[in-house]
Amino acid sequence: MNNEICEITCIHEDKVNRAKSKLANFDTPSVSGFFKILSDENRLKIVHALVHEDELCVCDIANIIDASVATTSHHLNSLKKLGVVDSHKDGKLVYYFIKNIKILNLMELGVNFKEEVLA
């Protein structure tokens, strides 16, 4: 017998209805898309690097994540569309920086979760 599933079917309608009501107002596609973008290791490395540096140019970021400038640029574009990073041009160089510092809280939460729960 599997102890991880119910042995009988019993629907708790009040709880199910409350949960469904809350879910109807939850923007699942956007939140899922946000986590999907951040689930890529290179994008996570980029965010981590930018959290610890005020700004980095694309060439520096490419070197840090050991990827081509084109690949790095693609990752940065995804992060920029998500509102995590922004950029500015200085002469011939394009610098990226963290746009919303709340991403730092999310990074810390991920690290703490891993250390406390997954250890």
From Swiss-Prot:
Q: Keywords in UniProt for this one?
A: Cadmium, Cadmium resistance, DNA-binding, Metal-binding, Plasmid, Transcription, Transcription regulation
Q: Which GO terms describe its molecular function?
A: DNA binding; DNA-binding transcription factor activity; metal ion binding
Stored SUPFAM superfamilies: Winged helix' DNA-binding domain
Q: Which regions of the protein are recorded as binding DNA?
A: 58-77
Query: What CDD domains does UniProt report for this protein, alphabetically?
Result: HTH_ARSR
Under the heading InterPro entries, the entry gives: ArsR-like_HTH (IPR011991), ArsR_HTH (IPR018334), HTH_ArsR_DNA-bd_dom (IPR001845), Metal_resp_trans_reg (IPR051011), WH-like_DNA-bd_sf (IPR036388), WH_DNA-bd_sf (IPR036390)
A Pfam family per the record: HTH_5
Q: Which residues form the HTH arsR-type domain?
A: 23-118
Q: Which residues bind Cd(2+)?
A: C6, C10, C57, C59
A single BP term in Gene Ontology: response to cadmium ion
Superkingdom of origin organism: Bacteria
Write out the function statement from the record: Metal-binding repressor for the cad operon. Involved in resistance to heavy metals, such as cadmium, bismuth, zinc or lead. Metal binding causes the repressor to dissociate from the DNA.
Q: How does it assemble?
A: Homodimer.
Q: What is this protein called?
A: Cadmium resistance transcriptional regulatory protein CadC
Gene responsible for this protein: cadC
